[in-house]
């Protein structure tokens, strides 16, 4: 058996999320597995670096799969992509060792959240942009966000459905910046809780509108109470930029936050 690593890009708008959930609806995982199985002429199961929710996009999701069939990387890339809908594409393929694991070999994961901050909702690229009509203070949001850095208990920002055994995560980097009418929030951590990024964004938006002071974010973190934090931000503005791996795996992780 040969193990392969793939870099996958997808528009999550029409999917119920990454994970295959029986017959409930289309998932990125099931769609990719079906295309790979056609190339391999046998069933294929993929394991991803990080599962995304319904409506969340993937810029460079990394997966691994095992196959008894030997194909050159180009054949896996082109053969699979031609069998995928236009909303999913394989960016690269690297043969790797059986020690590599898309999830457990990753040392960090990165997300990007983008929203349009103007009076009128977006018509172009609306599936990739959230929207906030009230003026936002991006600098205040950025300063408040720095209070989340480090290893902390992020219970205030996890969903009620989160199945993680504990809420401690290491937030390694977070930034909020404005480019004209678009505000971009970039986050990197060793791992994330369910809805963690969207819940952080929802709370930062309340700081941005002036509803809450910057210090409120630190109070939420210390309080560990989800009911005291802001609402969960829309999924449509969220992109899983991708995972980071140690250099020994030689994966083409050229995507930067």
Swiss-Prot record:
Q: Name one GO molecular function term.
A: RNA binding
Q: Name one GO biological process term.
A: tRNA pseudouridine synthesis
Q: Does the keyword Isomerase apply?
A: yes
Residues bound to substrate are 111
Highest taxon in the source lineage: Bacteria
Keyword annotations: Isomerase, tRNA processing
As recorded in UniProt, its EC number(s) are 5.4.99.12
Q: Which family does it belong to?
A: Belongs to the tRNA pseudouridine synthase TruA family.
Provide the assembly information.
Answer: Homodimer.
Q: Which PANTHER family match?
A: PSEUDOURIDYLATE SYNTHASE, TRNA PSEUDOURIDINE SYNTHASE-LIKE 1
Q: What is this protein called?
A: tRNA pseudouridine synthase A
According to its UniProt entry, this protein's organism is Xylella fastidiosa (strain Temecula1 / ATCC 700964)
Point out the gene that encodes the protein.
truA
